[in-house]
Every structure is written in structure tokens, then in C-alpha cells.
Regions:
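Conserved small/polar residues in nucleotide/adenosyl-binding loops
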Residues: 161-163
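Inter-motif core of Ras-like GTPase G domains
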Residues: 126-146
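The conserved Walker
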Residues: 11
Length: 163
């Protein structure tokens, strides 16, 4: 099955819960679901899974894949991956993310990938979430909210993703 990438119009909008709900529903249909959150930022401490999001996703999908594969990049500061990596002196390797994804794709029927922030959240200076979605050749689910201004954010996101 083609991977599903769950993105959003903003941060803290519900990507994890949508992704977990999908993982749980697919698992109930006897589909072997892999999960991946290539970038996690903001958690102060790394115990077990790198972030609460990963714990929720792994529990919903009922998987115990290696943490360094499902979350290749973990940054303990609340920022975009690009900013966090720059501040911490870490080099982000997108090829490594793709290798981790391929490993998951080989052992699962489908891989659900949860993004970070919105589609224009920078990963590298000239590479954003939207570029990762294209490189993964994933179908995309956009999570949005009902707050004022969301229609604009949603239309802008859709126009960039060409749906």
C-alpha cells in the first residue's frame, strides 16, 4: 500500500490523534501498520520513545519497531527541525530518513508518517515537509481545525500540495 503522510495547517492541531486513529482502524482490519515520525521536537527528556506522540502512535499501531528507525531525528527543543538542528549543531540527513522509511515499508503493509508543524515547516534550509512528502511519494491527509483563520490556512495548504 502507498504510505500515508499526516500533516496539518499548524502545530498542535491533532496530527497524532488522527494518525493513531488511522493506525488503530487499519490494525483492526488486520493490516500490518508501521508508524514513523521522522522528526520530533520539544520534549525535554528522552525516555523510551522520544516523544509522547511516538508512544501514542506505537500503542495504536501495536508495533515495537526500533526507536531510531521510527524517529530518526529527535530534538529536545521546541522548534522546527531546521532551527533545532542548527541550534544543537546537528546535521539532518534526509537520506537517512528515507532509509529508515524504506526499512519500515519493507516489513509493514502500510506506513503512516506523521509530520511536524505544517507542510512548509523547514527541515533543511531549502527542504521542507512538503518536499519530504513528495520524496516519500505518500498520499497526504491534512488535519485542520475549526478556529477562525483556518479556512485560509487550509486553502493555502491545499494549493501548495496540489490537491
Amino acid at each position: 500500500m502507498k504510505p500515508l503522510f499526516v500533516t496539518a495547517t499548524d502545530t498542535d492541531i491533532g496530527k497524532t490523534y488522527v494518525c493513531a486513529g488511522l493506525a488503530y482502524a487499519l490494525k483492526k482490519m488486520d493490516i500490518d501498520v508501521g508508524i514513523m515520525k521522522p522528526f520530533a521536537c520539544g520534549a525535554k527528556q528522552k525516555i523510551g520513545f522520544s516523544s509522547n506522540d511516538l508512544t501514542i502512535l506505537a500503542n495504536a499501531a501495536m508495533v515495537d519497531d526500533a526507536e531510531d528507525i521510527i524517529n530518526p531525528f529527535f530534538f529536545p527543543i521546541p522548534a522546527s527541525p531546521y532551527t533545532a538542528a542548527k541550534n544543537l549543531g546537528v546535521k539532518i540527513d534526509v537520506k537517512h530518513v528515507m532509509e529508515c522509511f524504506r526499512k519500515l515499508d519493507e516489513i509493514h503493509d502500510i506506513v503512516l508518517v506523521e509530520g511536524i508543524g505544517g507542510i512548509m515547516t523547514p527541515i533543511l534550509k531549502d527542504y521542507a515537509i512538503i518536499d519530504l512528502i513528495k520524496d516519500l511519494m505518500a498520499n497526504t491527509i491534512i488535519v485542520t481545525s475549526s478556529k477562525i483563520g483556518t479556512v485560509n490556512h487550509t486553502v493555502l495548504t491545499l494549493s501548495l500540495i496540489h490537491i
